[in-house]
A protein has these predicted regions:
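Membrane-embedded helix-loop-helix hairpins and adjacent transmembrane boundary segments
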Residues: 1-512
Length: 512
């Protein structure tokens, strides 16, 4: 191991130890002593922590690996339309969902998304919360797996550390601080990790431009690739020619933004903020950070292509390889002295941060679904506070293990795995969330129909319809989201109206 690699390893180890210490600190403070504290931090989150925790948990490894990799290999169309959709979705989620969800969930005493659905629609049998919990498990496990895959890829490509060993060690660190400190530990580590992610993005752009030969060289190189900068074409790296990116593809790619309305680990942040009025400040902070971060991430992919053209980084021919471009640039940086080696360590810690900040939130949301919604509400298992916390922590560990098993293949694509899980949550929960907050006539039968329809169409479209090609080959979130909305409306109108107590609560919430 070279001296530069030793410096990087020391930097990363210090970072990982710091994350565990945060978990220890909040564990001793009692932040994980009750279910309300463990899952929502006692609804005491400030606006800055709420904003950055929400967006750090949103911007998983696809920010520092998926987006740059996509831009590196195929040019701007898909990745740019995706980021535009995500930026719009982020803003609208904070603007129209956050305030009413915070108010509604506090009124009902709900501490998880499945619990909110059950209480909102007066589902005393908890069928809604049971189905919602199952949906969370189905889609969060592969989502978490993509994060563990990113950790393994980082250490394997940089140090030659065996992929599976690196993945397991990284997973253990995430599990440790999550089970010890709960929501508060997760949220404050997310804040710290968002800072590392920001530093990583800025530094790697500056270094990459310098290595490519300047900004003009980067732009000239991109222009020389057919369709690379064209928003309606795209670049085919396999043939070196331009490809077509149709209007239908643009619309379906913009549909990424719809996913935000159904992301449990993001929606929980809205429920946890200290004061409803502080959401305005959180919205501004979150939106600005997301827009700037995604723009820089895409630009890193373009820069990386130019650094490859300059002969300083080998060509990364596959999706899995192209997602390591930021790792390759950090490795190149580490070869330019001690100071830059330390910065490379910080950048790679930023990649870990992007992964860990999402994985911890997903593990926590999945744990709450199992211990609260499935075990207690659906199955009627009586548990005291201590047993509830033990069940939650055991669930975190079990889900992490399953996620590692699914991530065992080092050749899977982070971006593709995340896109499928994103579609699943967006279609299964997004329409139900919007109708629950804004349509009084929506009932539990309609919500159940929408949830099942959305989740099912994601699978059907991706594996049966999209392979037909042509106009059918669109992102599965768009048709699944629309199908879920239609199902909610039709079934709600075809079945009895909600009980008076349910509609009275809706009127009370909406009147404020």
């Amino acid at each position: 191991m070279t001296s530069a690699q030793i410096i990087i390893v020391v930097t990363i180890v210090l970072y990982l130890v710091a994350m565990v210490l945060v978990g220890v600190y909040f564990g001793k403070k009692g932040s994980g002593s009750s279910s309300d504290d463990f899952y929502l931090g006692g609804r005491k989150m400030g606006p800055v922590v709420t904003a950055m925790s929400a967006e750090a948990s949103d911007m998983s490894s696809y920010l520092l690996m998926g987006l740059p990799g996509l831009a590196y290999l195929f040019g701007l169309p898909e990745v740019t339309w995706t980021t535009i959709g995500l930026a719009i979705g982020t803003y609208l989620n904070w603007l129209i969902v956050a305030r009413r969800l915070r108010r509604y969930s506090a009124k009902l005493g709900a501490i998880t998304i499945p619990d909110f659905f059950a209480r909102r629609f007066g589902d005393k049998k908890h069928l809604l919360s049971c189905i919602a919990a199952v949906v969370i498990l189905i889609f969060f496990i592969p989502y978490t797996a993509s994060g563990f895959k990113a950790i393994g890829t980082l250490f394997n490509s940089l140090f030659g550390v065996e992929y599976h060993t690196a993945m397991i060690v990284g997973g253990i660190v995430v599990v440790l601080y999550t089970v010890m400190g709960g929501f508060m530990a997760v949220s404050f580590t997310d804040l710290i990790q968002s800072i590392f992610m920001t530093i990583a993005l800025i530094v790697i752009v500056c270094f990459g431009v310098q290595q490519a030969g300047g900004l003009d060289t980067v732009i000239d190189n991109a222009r020389a690739l057919p369709g690379y900068l064209n928003m309606t074409q795209g670049y085919d790296a396999a043939t070196g020619t331009a490809s077509t990116y149709s209007a239908l593809s643009i619309v379906s790619t913009l549909a990424w933004g719809l996913g935000y309305f159904g992301m449990p680990h993001i929606l929980l942040r809205f429920m946890a903020i200290r004061e409803e009025k502080e959401l305005n400040q959180s919205r501004r902070i979150a939106t600005i950070w997301v827009v700037i971060s995604m723009f820089i991430a895409v630009f890193i992919g373009v820069i990386g292509n130019s650094v490859t053209a300059a002969g300083k980084v080998p060509f990364l021919a596959t999706s899995a390889e192209s997602e390591t471009i930021i790792i390759k640039l950090a490795d190149l940086m580490s070869q330019h002295g001690v100071l830059l080696a330390i910065m490379a360590g910080i950048i790679l810690s930023g990649i870990l941060a992007a992964t860990m900040s999402t994985a911890d939130s997903q593990l926590l949301a999945a744990a709450s679904s199992v211990s609260q919604d499935l075990m207690q509400h659906s199955f009627g298992i009586k548990m005291n506070q201590r047993t509830t916390m033990l069940a939650a922590r055991a669930t975190v560990i079990c889900i992490a293990i399953i996620g590692m098993v699914l991530a065992w293949d080092p050749n899977s694509s982070v971006f593709r795995v995340v896109s499928f899980a994103w579609a699943g949550f967006g279609a299964a929960f997004g329409p139900v969330m919007l109708f629950s907050l804004f349509w009084k006539r929506a009932n539990k039968q309609g919500a159940l129909a929408g949830m099942i329809t959305g989740g099912a169409v994601v699978f059907i479209w991706k594996y049966l319809i999209a392979p037909m090609g042509g106009a059918w080959a669109i992102y599965e979130l768009l048709p699944a989201f629309l199908a879920a909305c239609i199902a909610i409306v039709i079934v709600s109108l075809a079945t009895p109206a909600p009980e008076k107590a349910v509609t009275d609560t809706f009127d009370e919430i909406c009147s404020k």
